[in-house]
């Protein structure tokens, strides 16, 4: 292991990690927004929109992110829509992640027994109170494991951004391997930085899930 090489190119990986995290966070935030909207449409069975959401979810979940990125990055300019590589990464991640988030949120909402909502209404609660005090707390608790898994999955999927010339972690590792043939050192840094990004997400997700279950949500 060449530690001098690692020390020399560590700042390059730090810069790439910041770009990876920035695109990942923005893309995931949009994915959550898309997921919430789609889950609400499916849960309340909104006519027409429900079928549009179903088509979107199936299309998104059954095509690789790399194909989606190529379609956005190389296909959209053919119809006059041009995006930077960073924006393309955000859109691609949001498109893919939105479908996974939608399924997580939908399953969480549907895990709450209808009789609980009916009982709450019989006690005098209105629809907003039922949603806020009965359905959402339990649905959130049920959704957390899948939600955290989706975040980790999407952050790992950022590794394909190098295919559209984004100078992320994977691009940096491949570039250094091609230039200096330092495969072990380059991949070592790649693994270390992905662990630094993903492990905190996993730990925080587990703590939140444990805290909510301790508080009695979802039981």
Predicted features, each with a name:
Residues 1-219:
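Transmembrane alpha-helices and adjacent helix-loop boundaries
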């Amino acid at each position: 292991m060449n530690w001098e090489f690692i020390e020399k190119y560590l700042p390059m990986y730090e810069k790439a990690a910041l770009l990876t995290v920035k695109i990942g966070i923005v893309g995931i935030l949009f994915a959550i927004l898309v997921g919430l909207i789609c889950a609400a449409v499916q849960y309340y069975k909104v006519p027409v929109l429900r079928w549009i959401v179903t088509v979107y979810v199936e299309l998104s979940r059954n095509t690789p992110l790399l194909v989606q990125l190529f379609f956005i990055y190389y296909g959209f300019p053919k119809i006059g829509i041009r995006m930077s590589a960073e924006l393309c990464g955000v859109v691609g991640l949001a498109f893919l992640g939105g479908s996974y988030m939608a399924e997580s949120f939908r399953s969480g909402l549907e895990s709450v027994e209808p009789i609980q909502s009916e009982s709450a209404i019989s006690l005098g609660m209105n629809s907003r109170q039922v949603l806020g005090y009965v359905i959402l707390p339990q649905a959130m608790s049920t959704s957390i494991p899948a939600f955290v898994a989706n975040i980790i999955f999407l952050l790992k999927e950022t590794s394909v951004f190098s295919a559209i010339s984004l100078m992320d972690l994977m691009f940096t590792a491949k570039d250094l391997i091609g230039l200096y043939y330092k495969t072990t050192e380059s991949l070592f840094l790649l693994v270390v930085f992905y662990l630094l990004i993903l492990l905190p997400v996993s730990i925080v997700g587990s703590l939140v899930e444990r805290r909510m279950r301790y508080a009695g949500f979802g039981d």
